[in-house]
């Protein structure tokens, strides 16, 4: 984010009360910003065709601020208006900041992120942007110099989509790191790369069967090459020592503090297992959450889901909400795990994996919906999206009242044109990530071909069909 634009994204508190909140005038505001270019974003939404709302502060010369001063009291917006109007909210203890024309925006809300991973990755080897196996290994070496023998070296960020036709192997990684198990997670988490010591620690050898919905890449002799795809990744990641509760809380706080510095006021945690959820609850009870958390329980953690079916949705806290569940229906386009209606263009005979074969529990998902929880289902391929729509429509048909829970399809990345019109009638939100379009640009058409790619990243087409969209960065 451009720091001169942020002052900082409305103080990381959110635009929760725009105008006229004049309570507590006697003591005055806690904080006042003056002489800013304030964009309240309180005008109407764009039309389905993208036309700007009639009441938006926009003309032929561009966008214009609709206020210049903001008053804050007890973590809430007290007043928004002109610098002169704001004077009534001055008190003896008010801090006033002249922002000298800087842009002030409402706090940001990210609707799909992985907070603990965002924090954890700050202490792992960062491989984002590496172009070759050798570059990746050099970066691991530079970042892990001095690591004691036997200790795990963990990194992340190599692009499984970009590297899918030339995956590395354990050979060079093992030569460089003979005395440490090394596990390197891909950019989106749908592939992992390990050295031989890591494979041995995890008990992965030529006899290891592939789990449903996963692949262990093997050489001509049947030995694992060091690359595990989709659900097979857990065979290796499970061998890495779990963080302590204190470390996990630290990862979560690091992730949230990183977001707070960039102007976020709330985040949707896309999948929280028991340990993560309990950490959120401890942090909330101690008043330590710096950003509001909308926790989506992990459907893969059945015990946690059963616990919350008994408890019911939790919405009473100002800092932690738990009324949603995250599920995976298929895998990723980059790893060719997303479920397609027809063969992958660059792998004839292969259509990806979905549903029960990818660990989707239809019965538990329906129970969670019927217990009052919103569900957000990860679906990327056109078949994955179609089958997810089939499932959601069937549950809603038997329980029409649950449509009000605003169920979601996470990513909705490749949607067949025949299915675009099915979202809105069922009230299903398309929770999409514009960065994926940019990240996948170099290989997406290779995967699905020139015709199917027209249904990929189809934000405007979905919006024209009346579908509610929510955008996010899929931070991790």
Predicted regions located by residue number:
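Phosphate/diphosphate-binding loops
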Residues: 291-323, 406-412, 417, 443-469
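Histidine/acidic-residue-rich catalytic or RNA/ligand-binding cores of hydrolases
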Residues: 196, 277, 281, 385-393, ...
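Short acidic/histidine-rich active-site segments
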Residues: 333-336, 373-383, 432-434, 462-476
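Bacterial N-terminal signal peptides that target proteins for export
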Residues: 1-8
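Divalent metal-binding segments
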Residues: 21-34, 42-308, 323, 327-384, ...
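Bacterial N-terminal signal peptides
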Residues: 8-17
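Non-cysteine beta-strand/loop elements that form the S-adenosyl-L-methionine
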Residues: 319-337, 427-438
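Flexible glycine/proline-rich, aromatic-decorated loop/lid segments
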Residues: 341-345, 425-462
């Amino acid at each position: 984010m451009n720091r001169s634009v942020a002052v900082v994204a409305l103080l990381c508190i959110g635009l929760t009360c725009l105008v006229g909140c004049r309570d507590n005038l006697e003591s005055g505001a806690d904080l006042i910003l003056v002489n800013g270019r304030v964009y309240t974003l309180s005008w109407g939404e764009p039309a389905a065709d993208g036309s700007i709302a009639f009441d938006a502060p926009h003309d032929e010369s561009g966008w214009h601020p609709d206020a210049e001063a903001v008053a804050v009291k007890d973590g809430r917006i007290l007043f928004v208006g002109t610098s002169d109007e704001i004077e009534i909210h001055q008190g003896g203890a008010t801090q006033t900041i002249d922002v000298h024309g800087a842009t002030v925006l409402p706090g940001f809300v990210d609707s799909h992120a992985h907070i603990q991973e965002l924090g954890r990755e700050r202490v792992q080897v960062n491989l984002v942007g590496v172009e070759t196996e050798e570059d990746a290994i050099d970066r691991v070496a530079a970042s892990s110099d001095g690591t004691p023998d036997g200790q795990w070296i963990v990194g992340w960020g190599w692009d499984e989509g970009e590297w899918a036709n030339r995956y590395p192997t354990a050979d060079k990684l093992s030569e460089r790191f003979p005395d440490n198990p090394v596990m390197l997670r891909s950019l989106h988490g749908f592939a992992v790369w390990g050295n031989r010591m890591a494979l041995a620690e995890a008990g992965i050898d030529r006899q290891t069967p592939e789990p449903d919905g996963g692949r262990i890449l093997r050489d001509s002799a049947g030995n694992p090459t060091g690359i595990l795809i989709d659900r097979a990744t857990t065979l290796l990641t499970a061998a890495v020592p779990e963080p302590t509760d204190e470390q996990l809380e630290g990862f979560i706080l690091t992730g949230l503090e990183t977001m707070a510095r960039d102007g976020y006021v709330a985040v949707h945690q896309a999948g929280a297992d028991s340990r993560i959820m309990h950490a959120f609850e401890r942090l909330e009870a101690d008043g330590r959450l710096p950003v509001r958390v909308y926790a989506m329980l992990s459907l893969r953690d059945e015990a946690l889901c059963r616990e919350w079916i008994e408890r019911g949705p939790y919405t009473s806290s100002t800092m932690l909400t738990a009324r949603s569940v995250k599920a995976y229906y298929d895998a990723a386009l980059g790893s060719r795990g997303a479920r397609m209606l027809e063969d992958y263009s660059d792998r004839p005979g292969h259509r990806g994996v979905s549903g029960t074969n990818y660990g989707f529990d239809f019965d538990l998902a329906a129970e969670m919906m019927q217990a009052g929880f919103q569900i957000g289902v990860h679906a990327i391929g056109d078949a994955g999206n179609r089958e997810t729509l089939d499932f959601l429509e069937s549950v809603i048909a038997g329980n029409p009242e649950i449509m009000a829970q605003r169920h979601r399809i996470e990513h909705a990345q490749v949607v067949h044109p025949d299915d675009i019109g099915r979202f809105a009638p069922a009230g299903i939100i398309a929770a999409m990530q514009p960065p994926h379009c940019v990240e996948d640009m170099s290989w997406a058409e290779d995967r699905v071909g020139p015709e199917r790619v027209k249904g990929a990243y189809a934000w405007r087409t979905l919006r024209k069909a009346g579908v509610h969209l929510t955008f996010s960065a899929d931070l991790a």
